[in-house]
C-alpha cells in the first residue's frame, strides 16, 4: 500500500502539461480546487472527471498512477461515505431501522463528498506527477515573491514545502524496506487484534523516525557545505516565462469554471 502513494513522485515526460509554467500549474490547481467544491450535481462531477482524464491523457501519464493515488484512501472514502450517509437526514427516507435512517439527502451528500475527495486527490497527484520539486519550488517562490516586500519568507516557505514533498517518496521507500526487513525477522502486521497490530507498527515507526532524522541531518549538512543561507542574493539557472500553452491551459480552466457556474445558476 505504501508504494501506491504517488504524492511527491514525478513522472518524466515532455508533454504539453509537463512544459507548462509551474506558476500556471499552481494557479490552475487553486482554481481547480474551487471548481471541485462548487460542483453540485452528477453531470458536473462527470464533466470535471472528464477534464482530469483529458489532462492525464495529454500528459501521457498512465491512468493507473491516478488509481494508485486513490488506493491508500479507500478506508477514508468508505468512512466518510458512511458518516455522511447516516448523519445527513434530509429528503425522503429510503431505509429506516432502529436509530439508522438513510435518506435521499444523506445518500446525495455521501456521494458528493466522496467524489470531491477523489477528484481533489487525482488533480493534486497529476500536478506533482508532471512537475519536478525544483520547478514547484521556483513557481511557488515567484508567486509569493511580492509578499517578500512586507517581510514574508517566500523562498524559505517554498523550500520547506519542496523538501517535504521530496521526502514523501523517500520515506515511503524507507518504510517499505523496514517493513520487509521486520517481516523477514518474523514480525506480523496483518493478523491479530487492532492493538496487536498497532504494537507491531512500533517496530516500523521507530526505525523510520531515526532514518528521517538522519536524512534531515545529512540534507542540512549538504546545504551548509554548499553555502546555502536562504534566498537572498541567489540567482536562478532557469528563467520562467509564460507561453501560449499557459494561456490555452488557463482558458480551458476558465471555460470549465464558467460552465459549472452557469449550470449551477440555471438548475
Regions found by a protein language model. Give the residues of each.
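Transmembrane alpha-helix interface motif
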Residues: 1-42, 48-57, 142-145, 149-152, ...
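Transmembrane helix-loop junctions in multipass membrane proteins, especially transporters and channels
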Residues: 41, 45, 60-64, 88-96, ...
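Alpha-helical transmembrane segments and their helix-start/interface "positive-inside/aromatic belt" motifs
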Residues: 25, 64-74, 249
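Loop-to-transmembrane-helix entry motif
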Residues: 69-73, 77, 114, 118-121, ...
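Juxtamembrane/interface alpha-helical elements of multi-pass membrane proteins
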Residues: 73-187
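Alpha-helical transmembrane segments and their membrane-interface exit regions
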Residues: 51-61, 76-79
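Membrane-helix interfacial "entry" motifs
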Residues: 14, 37, 60-65, 97, ...
Amino acid at each position: 500500500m505504501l508504494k501506491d502513494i504517488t504524492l511527491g513522485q514525478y513522472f518524466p515526460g515532455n508533454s504539453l502539461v509537463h512544459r507548462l509554467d509551474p506558476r500556471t500549474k499552481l494557479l490552475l490547481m487553486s482554481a481547480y480546487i474551487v471548481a471541485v467544491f462548487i460542483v453540485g450535481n452528477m453531470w458536473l462531477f462527470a464533466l470535471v472527471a472528464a477534464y482530469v482524464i483529458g489532462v492525464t491523457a495529454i500528459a501521457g501519464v498512465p491512468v493507473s498512477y491516478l488509481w494508485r493515488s486513490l488506493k491508500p484512501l479507500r478506508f477514508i472514502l468508505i468512512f466518510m461515505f458512511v458518516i455522511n450517509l447516516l448523519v445527513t437526514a434530509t429528503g425522503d427516507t429510503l431505509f429506516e431501522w432502529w436509530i439508522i435512517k438513510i435518506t435521499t439527502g444523506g445518500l446525495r451528500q455521501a456521494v458528493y463528498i466522496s467524489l470531491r475527495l477523489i477528484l481533489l486527490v487525482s488533480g493534486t497527484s497529476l500536478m506533482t506527477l508532471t512537475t519536478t520539486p525544483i520547478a514547484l519550488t521556483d513557481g511557488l517562490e515567484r508567486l509569493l515573491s511580492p509578499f517578500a516586500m512586507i517581510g514574508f519568507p517566500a523562498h524559505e516557505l517554498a523550500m520547506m514545502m519542496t523538501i517535504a514533498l521530496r521526502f514523501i517518496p523517500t520515506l515511503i521507500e524507507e518504510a517499505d524496506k523496514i517493513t520487509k526487513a521486520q517481516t523477514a525477522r518474523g514480525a506480523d502486521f496483518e493478523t491479530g487484534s487492532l492493538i496487536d497490530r498497532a504494537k507491531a507498527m512500533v517496530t516500523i515507526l521507530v526505525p523510520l523516525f531515526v532514518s528521517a532524522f538522519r536524512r534531515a541531518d545529512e540534507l542540512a549538512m549538504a546545504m551548509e557545505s554548499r553555502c546555502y543561507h536562504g534566498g537572498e542574493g541567489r540567482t536562478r539557472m532557469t528563467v520562467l516565462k509564460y507561453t501560449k500553452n499557459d494561456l490555452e491551459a488557463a482558458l480551458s480552466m476558465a471555460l470549465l469554471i464558467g460552465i459549472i457556474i452557469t449550470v449551477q445558476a440555471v438548475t
